[in-house]
């Protein structure tokens, strides 16, 4: 068995199918984390629109002091946005016009998968060349990482990005109308 972050058992590691499964898992891990990062950066812009407006200096300070990943994670940013939008009637109207319950579920799913890929155990079984992600979500769970599943996660993440970017565009336009 080969664990992505550390060597456990070399038996079968030289088999081409194991190596391919390992490379596929690394590639999908990187892409899921990358697309989640893009969503997080877009959320940063939406939160800046809401809290500090368009002035560059304020935005940069807000991002570096409040929205930095050391202070505020992706899930916390989502909760802040959800709470903030509900407190401002015209933004709430815009958000509800854009709101799609399925996309919100996909955002939560993206956050969960991003955290699992980033922090939990990705294992390639040397005997079967099957890659699994072992993670904790209330209890220990595992999911087989196939190309189909990984591409589905990535496609959902891209839809979430487009949705958040749409919120950013709508909020940015609404801010310009107020100025």
Enumerate the predicted regions with their spans.
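Amphipathic alpha-helical interface elements
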Residues: 1-86, 101-112, 119-126, 158-179
């Amino acid at each position: 068995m080969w664990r992505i972050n550390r060597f456990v058992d070399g038996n079968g590691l030289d088999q081409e199918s194991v190596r391919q499964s390992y490379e596929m898992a690394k590639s999908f891990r990187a892409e899921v984390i990358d697309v989640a990062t893009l969503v997080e950066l877009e959320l940063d812009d939406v939160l800046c629109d809401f809290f500090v407006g368009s002035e560059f200096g304020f935005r940069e300070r807000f991002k570096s002091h409040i929205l930095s990943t050391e202070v505020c994670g992706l899930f916390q940013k989502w909760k802040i946005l959800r709470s903030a939008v509900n407190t401002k009637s015209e933004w709430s109207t815009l958000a509800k016009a854009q709101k799609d319950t399925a996309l919100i579920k996909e955002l939560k799913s993206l956050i969960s998968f991003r955290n699992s890929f980033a922090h939990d155990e990705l294992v390639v079984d040397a005997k079967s060349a099957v890659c699994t992600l072992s993670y904790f979500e209330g209890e220990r769970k595992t999911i087989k990482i196939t190309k189909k599943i990984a591409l589905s996660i990535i496609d959902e993440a891209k839809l979430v990005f487009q949705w958040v970017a749409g919120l950013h565009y709508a909020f940015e336009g609404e801010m310009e109308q107020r100025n």
